[in-house]
């Protein structure tokens, strides 16, 4: 593969890492790989990046308190990072990133090693951040979650962009299997039944959408 990467119209190879980190934050697939291991509490762990940036103490406290609240982990602030569950640790990792106040957060399969409850915790936290205007880019293979929480979906195959559209449009494509993608279960059921929205001619992608169509028939709109 080849090409160029731009962030905010700036090619990244021309930008210092320190400056780029202030624009883009990355959350790893495995939260254990993101924990410094040098801090005794969750609060100190979130402060680590801010300390490296030389953020003034008062501003640092404000950002840490805000990120703890945003990720709903205030009650864990005095716990040791490695005493947290997988979902809690991933939320701590996200909190440490949003404390840096980046414009964009990139998440690399952040729920791949989490149980259903932990996955739901992370997706809800990410949704809250998105609603606050933070750009979220997530690589994820859990189709039901993508359908329920995404505004737009990129369909990739062998490193190439196939499509970029709303979840309903993406999962209603007839060639998904050719690209190694399995649509959400609700979408597959409605496809078998030939039930789709009248307005857009798309299959439902969430339980709520499927329930509405199955209850009211194809004349209903979603």
What label would you give each PLM region?
Residues 2-11, 20:
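Conserved ABC transporter NBD signature motif
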Residues 47, 51, 58-76:
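Conserved ABC ATPase "signature" region
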Residues 105-108:
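Catalytic Walker B motif of ABC-type/P-loop ATPase nucleotide-binding domains
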Residues 140-141:
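H-loop/switch region of ABC-family ATPase nucleotide-binding domains
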Residues 172-222:
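ABC ATPase nucleotide-binding domains
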């Amino acid at each position: 593969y080849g090409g160029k990467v731009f962030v905010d119209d700036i090619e990244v190879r021309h930008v210092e890492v320190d400056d780029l980190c202030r624009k883009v934050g990355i959350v790893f697939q495995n939260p254990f790989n993101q924990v410094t291991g040098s801090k005794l509490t969750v609060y100190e762990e979130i402060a680590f990046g801010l300390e490296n940036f030389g953020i003034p103490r008062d501003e640092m406290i404000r950002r840490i308190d805000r990120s703890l609240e945003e990720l709903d982990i205030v009650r864990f602030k005095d716990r040791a990072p490695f005493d947290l569950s997988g979902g809690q640790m991933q939320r701590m990792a996200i909190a440490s990133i949003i404390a840096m106040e980046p414009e964009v957060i990139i998440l690399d399969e952040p729920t791949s090693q989490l149980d259903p409850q932990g996955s739901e915790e992370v997706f809800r936290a990410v949704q809250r951040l998105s609603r606050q205007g933070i750009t979220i880019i997530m690589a994820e293979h859990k189709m039901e979650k993508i359908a329920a929480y995404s505004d737009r979906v990129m369909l990739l195959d062998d490193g190439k962009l196939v499509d970029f559209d709303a979840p309903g449009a993406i999962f209603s494509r007839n060639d998904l299997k050719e690209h190694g993608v399995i649509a959400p279960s609700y979408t597959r059921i409605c496809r078998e039944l030939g039930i789709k929205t009248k307005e857009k001619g798309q299959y439902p992608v969430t339980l709520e959408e499927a329930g509405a169509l199955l209850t009211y028939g194809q004349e209903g709109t979603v």
